[in-house]
């Protein structure tokens, strides 16, 4: 992938949607919930504070993160689906 996010934006590879329920029933594509977690693949340089200082990003490539259901913009690059979102759309880093 040759994408580099700008400023405080983050590129996330969403986790795949569940294919079947815990009981073993297969879920059709129309019934699948969008996952609200994924892996960070790239981060921007950060954002500028009011004083003009560059604030470092709290996430880094490889982090597993939780984000809002409607966060980010969906993009497809080289057949792969990604989300581009602001750092503030990320709720937590999974440890």
Swiss-Prot record:
GO BP terms in the entry: chaperone cofactor-dependent protein refolding
A GO CC term assigned to this protein in UniProt: cytoplasm
Pfam families cross-referenced by the UniProt entry: Cpn10
SMART domains: Cpn10
Location in the cell: Cytoplasm
Keyword terms, alphabetized: Chaperone, Cytoplasm
UniProt keyword ATP-binding, yes or no: no
Example GO molecular function: unfolded protein binding
Primary localization class, coarse: cytoplasm
Annotated family: Belongs to the GroES chaperonin family.
HAMAP family reported for this sequence: CH10
Its biological purpose: Together with the chaperonin GroEL, plays an essential role in assisting protein folding. The GroEL-GroES system forms a nano-cage that allows encapsulation of the non-native substrate proteins and provides a physical environment optimized to promote and accelerate protein folding. GroES binds to the apical surface of the GroEL ring, thereby capping the opening of the GroEL channel.
Subunit structure: Heptamer of 7 subunits arranged in a ring. Interacts with the chaperonin GroEL.
NCBIfam families, alphabetized: PRK00364.1-2, PRK00364.1-5, PRK00364.2-2, PRK00364.2-4, PRK00364.2-5
Descriptive protein name: Co-chaperonin GroES
Species this chain originates from: Chlorobium phaeovibrioides (strain DSM 265 / 1930)
């Amino acid at each position: 992938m040759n994408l580099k996010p700008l400023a405080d934006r983050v590129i996330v590879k969403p986790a795949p949607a569940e294919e079947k329920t815990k009981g073993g029933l297969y879920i059709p594509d129309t019934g699948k919930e969008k996952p609200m977690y994924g892996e960070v693949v790239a981060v921007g340089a950060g954002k500028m504070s009011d004083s003009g200082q560059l604030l470092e990003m709290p996430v880094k490539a490889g982090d597993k993160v939780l984000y809002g259901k409607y966060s980010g913009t969906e993009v497809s690059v080289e057949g792969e689906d990604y989300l581009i979102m602001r750092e503030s759309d990320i709720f937590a880093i999974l440890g």
